A protein has these predicted regions:
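N-terminal nucleophile
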Residues: 1-131, 136
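Short acidic, glycine/serine/threonine-rich helix-capping segments at coil-helix boundaries
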Residues: 130-199
Length: 199
């Protein structure tokens, strides 16, 4: 259990199957049973403490470290991450900021990482330090991608004109990236990366 102030407590009963145990620290508790060894929870705790950034990323890094250190001695099957934040759900309708799970897969933590990447793409917020100006080579590249995807019929001029803007806005809306849309001449680099990778 970890309370709202980051104080943690855990209990491992004597009837758990080896290896079983836990480590608690400020803002976290790592525990398990039927693990390969104590190395699993030690790796999780160490990684959580040393990783910076958002909680969801730290949790995923800890899960990955635990698996790399041996994990469950029966193998892999499922993984999940739940992070709650007041009003943090889609459009603020609930508090489930991140609620992802893989119930049955040979590499569930890898699958969970893929789901988190998609979650951040579609529901993440634009970083104001991660914007690209749409002009010159960037504008031309966007126009070429929009031609390939059928959103734009004009020439690749490198000018961010109204026709290009409308085509880009349509693309962003159809791809469900409208939460990252800006109405000026700046583009979230996540959108540009998505366009380059997929199209």
């Amino acid at each position: 259990i970890v309370d709202a102030k980051g104080n943690a407590a855990a209990f491992t009963g004597e009837e758990c199957f080896d290896w079983a145990g836990h480590i608690v620290g400020q803002h976290y508790a790592c525990q398990g049973n039927i693990l390969v060894s104590e190395d699993t929870v030690q790796a999780m705790a160490h990684t959580f403490e040393k990783t910076s950034g958002a909680l969801v990323g730290r949790l995923l890094a800890a899960l990955q470290a635990g698996q790399e250190a041996g994990g469950d001695r029966r193998g892999q099957q499922s993984a999940a991450i739940l992070v709650v934040r007041e009003g943090g759900g889609i459009l603020g309708f609930n508090d489930r900021y991140v609620d992802l799970r893989v119930d049955d897969h040979p590499t569930p933590i890898e699958q969970l990482a893929s789901l988190l990447k998609l979650h951040e793409l579609y529901l993440g917020e634009t970083d104001p330090d991660n914007l690209v100006q749409i002009q010159g080579e960037v504008a031309a590249e966007i126009q070429e991608i929009l031609v390939r995807t059928g959103y734009y019929q004009g020439p690749s001029t490198g000018v961010y004109d109204e026709a290009t803007k409308k085509a880009l806005r349509d693309f962003v809306s159809i791809e469900n990236l409208e939460g990252r849309w800006r109405d000026d001449d700046l583009l979230d680099s996540v959108i540009l990366g998505f366009m380059r990778e997929r199209f």
